Structure formats: structure tokens, C-alpha cells
Swiss-Prot record:
The chain crosses the membrane at residues 27-49, 125-144. One of its GO terms (biological process) is peroxisome organization. Residues 50-124 are peroxisomal. One of its GO terms (cellular component) is peroxisome. This is Peroxisome biogenesis factor 3. Pfam families: Peroxin-3. The keyword Membrane applies. One of its GO terms (molecular function) is protein-macromolecule adaptor activity. The keyword Coiled coil applies. It is a multi-pass membrane protein. Keywords: Coiled coil, Membrane, Peroxisome, Peroxisome biogenesis, Transmembrane, Transmembrane helix.
Length: 405
């Protein structure tokens, strides 16, 4: 445009431009229907594209809502089932009674010094073993049941939820018998089988014997000192290379999952002439292999650590009250509070406690944890970490934009 000159518009050139415009006008006039149809078709195509995209966005939004509704309802179902499982095996079946605990009365009445020492050692080991067993059982069973339910959801129900189509629902990849064998319930819980649970208890107990070797029953403990003891014991179980590797002899998670031989025995016991159960065996094996792979992931380890922390936090919060001194609190309040410019609450000071007094208080707290287990299960289930992991398991990290509606 910078080099444009008016003198370039000679009469001949102006005439040529005029003739070209006239021809173009004639073309539009002679082909007005075609031009109209092309314009109309383009408009229809654009409108159709917008409508279909809008429809797809709506379908995606509805599908996401259906999946989320299904997910939230099944997580609540899992919470209720875990509560029922633990209630049955710990409250009703008294499975923790496998950990024999001598009474204080029997210790006091024992005359033989060596026997008395043996009983006191057994007392401290058994109570701390019970404590760790309960504080590990609640998060482990909670997380494991969630994984089971969401794996079954992925293979059996997700398509139906996505498409809301009964035909899709009937094409489940895993049958009801396999689902029943796979998911732990109050009537079928592999973890709480006698031999299995006894091995779980023994693993904890042996480590606690070592950790409590220098923790004498006639000594005193502070609240902070006891917390350090708990942390030291936990470190023996909760390092990633130990707990997340079920091939490790010290992994607590391996007691949640049957071995391949045990899966085979289970399937063989249900074999009938009409069904040789080979497919069920392969499906069960596939599901448990997925669980093993999840166990070894960093995401799962983060969820497990966070869930165990929730469990121990509930215990230590309540135990702290046993170390609080009301009398010292009154003395401090009478000195400090009158001089404060605003009202505030001073934390109660903590005292030390003889371990022989502390142990029965811990035993009582174990009972309180079992009674209030539902609260711990709900706290674990409400964390972002566990919900993100399980939503990922259910949907297999599905890209909703690629779903064909």
C-alpha cells in the first residue's frame, strides 16, 4: 500500500476493474441459489457443530455427576462395611484376646521375683501390641476395602454408570461369585482368619519386644517421651521399602492378601461339574495383582501414612489428657490469668507418670478407640488423598472428553 500511486489508475485499468466487478455481479445473480445454498449449508454446519458440542458437554457433565454420585455412595457403603467388619471380629469375636495380657492383680500376688519380672514384661508387651494392632487394623482395613470396592466398580459398574444403559450393565467383566470372593465383608474377611491374624499379631509383638527392652515398668514416662517411643516403633513398620513391599517379611500389608496358592484353593473348593472355575481363578488373580501394584505405588504409600497418622493422632490426643495435671493448671491460672490483658486458655501442664500406672490407662484408651472406631474410619475416608486415589482406581484415570456418548 505504501507504493500505491493515483496515476496507476489509467482509464484502461479502471475500465477493466469495472468489467470484472460487473462479471462478478452477474455471476452472483445467475448463481444466487447456489450461493444461498453454500451459505446456508455453512450456517447449518456451524449450528450443528455448536449443538453437538453443547450436547456432548452436557453429556460429559451428566456422566461426571453420575460417576461422582456412584463414587460417593460406595465410599459411604465402604465406611459402614468396615465398621461392621471390625465390630464383628474385634468386639464380638474378641479376636484381640489372642494377645494374652496378665492382670495387675496376678503380678502383685506373684511371689517369685523371676516370674513377676516375666509377667510385667508380658504386660507391657501385650498392651502395646494391642495398641499397635488396633491403630493399624482400622486404617489398613479401611483403605483395603475401599480399593476392593472401587476395583469391582471399575470392572462391573462403571460402564453402566457412564452410559446409564442396562445393556452395558449386563456386560460385567467379573461375575457375582468372584466379586463375593474378592471383597472383604463381615462374613468373609481373609485378614481376620485365625492363622493369618495370628501371624499379623506375632509380627507386631516380636518387634515391640525389642523396642520395649529398655522401657521398664517401674520407671516414669513423660508424654513427649512416650510419643518418641511410639515413633521409634512405627519406624520399624512404616518405611516404604518395608510396608509397601508385600514380599518383605516385615510388611503388614501382606496379611491382607491371599497367596496365589490360597486363591487356587478357594476357587477349587467352589468347583462344580458345570463350571471348572478357570476364569474365576484368573479374574481373582488379576484383581489381587492390581492390588499388589497399587500397594507399591507412591500414591498408595502417601495415603497409607496419612491414614495411619489419623489413627495414631486420635489415640495421642486422648492420651494427652491422662498426662494433664488439673491441680497444676489451677495454680498456674491463679498466677497468670489475672495479669493477662485478654481472656485465653492456657494448656494444662503435663506431668510424668509411672509406667505401671500408664499401662492400664493405655489399655483403657484402646477400648475407647474400638468404641469410637467409626469416627476414625470417617476421618480417614474424608481425606483428599484417599478419595483421589480411589477415584483414580474406579475411573482408571478416564478422560471424559474421549467417551463416546
Amino acid at each position: 500500500m505504501e507504493n500505491f500511486q493515483f496515476e496507476d489508475l489509467s482509464p484502461n485499468k479502471v475500465s477493466k476493474v469495472y468489467q470484472d466487478l460487473k462479471k462478478f455481479g452477474s455471476f452472483l445473480y445467475n448463481h444466487k441459489m447456489g450461493v444461498f445454498l453454500v451459505s446456508f449449508s455453512s450456517g447449518v454446519a456451524y449450528l450443528y457443530h455448536n449443538i453437538t458440542q453443547s450436547h456432548k458437554r452436557k453429556q460429559i457433565k451428566l456422566a461426571k455427576e453420575r460417576v461422582m454420585t456412584y463414587f460417593e455412595s460406595t465410599q459411604k457403603l465402604s465406611e459402614r462395611e468396615v465398621d461392621a467388619i471390625i465390630t464383628k471380629f474385634i468386639d464380638e469375636n474378641k479376636i484381640l484376646d489372642k494377645i494374652q495380657t496378665p492382670s495387675l492383680a496376678s503380678i502383685r500376688s506373684e511371689k517369685d521375683p523371676s516370674e513377676k519380672l516375666k509377667l510385667t514384661d508380658q504386660l507391657k508387651v501385650s498392651i502395646i501390641t494391642k495398641l499397635f494392632s488396633v491403630l493399624y487394623i482400622i486404617p489398613m482395613v479401611t483403605i483395603f476395602n475401599r480399593l476392593q470396592i472401587n476395583l469391582i466398580g471399575k470392572y462391573c459398574y462403571l460402564d453402566y454408570v457412564l452410559y446409564k444403559d442396562q445393556e452395558q450393565h449386563s456386560m460385567r467383566l467379573i461375575n457375582q461369585q468372584t466379586e463375593s470372593n474378592f471383597i472383604n465383608s463381615r462374613n468373609n474377611c481373609y485378614f481376620f482368619k485365625d492363622i493369618n491374624f495370628s501371624q499379623f499379631i506375632n509380627l507386631i509383638q516380636e518387634q515391640i519386644k525389642i523396642s520395649l527392652k529398655d522401657w521398664k515398668i517401674d520407671q516414669q514416662s513423660s508424654f513427649e517421651g512416650f510419643l518418641k517411643l511410639l515413633i521409634n516403633i512405627r519406624n520399624n513398620f512404616e518405611k516404604k521399602e518395608i510396608i509397601a513391599s508385600i514380599s518383605s517379611d516385615n510388611s503388614l500389608l501382606k496379611y491382607l492378601i491371599p497367596t496365589e496358592e490360597e486363591i487356587d484353593n478357594l476357587v477349587q473348593s467352589q468347583k462344580t461339574p458345570e463350571n471348572d472355575n478357570d476364569i474365576e481363578y484368573q479374574n481373582l488373580k488379576m484383581l489381587y495383582n492390581e492390588i499388589r501394584n497399587i500397594f507399591e505405588s507412591q500414591k498408595f504409600y502417601d495415603v497409607l501414612k496419612d491414614s495411619i497418622n489419623q489413627s495414631f493422632l486420635e489415640f495421642t490426643k486422648n492420651l494427652r489428657e491422662d498426662f494433664e495435671s488439673t491441680e497444676l493448671k489451677k495454680q498456674i491460672d491463679s498466677i497468670v490469668l489475672p495479669d493477662l490483658p485478654i481472656e485465653m486458655e492456657i494448656p494444662k501442664p503435663l506431668v510424668t507418670m509411672h509406667n505401671i500406672i500408664l499401662l492400664p490407662k493405655i489399655n483403657k484408651q484402646i477400648g475407647n478407640i474400638i468404641v469410637n472406631k467409626k469416627s476414625i474410619i470417617e476421618k480417614i475416608g474424608s481425606t483428599d488423598l484417599i478419595n483421589q486415589l480411589n477415584y483414580s482406581v474406579l475411573t482408571n484415570d478416564l478422560d471424559f472428553n474421549k467417551v463416546q456418548f
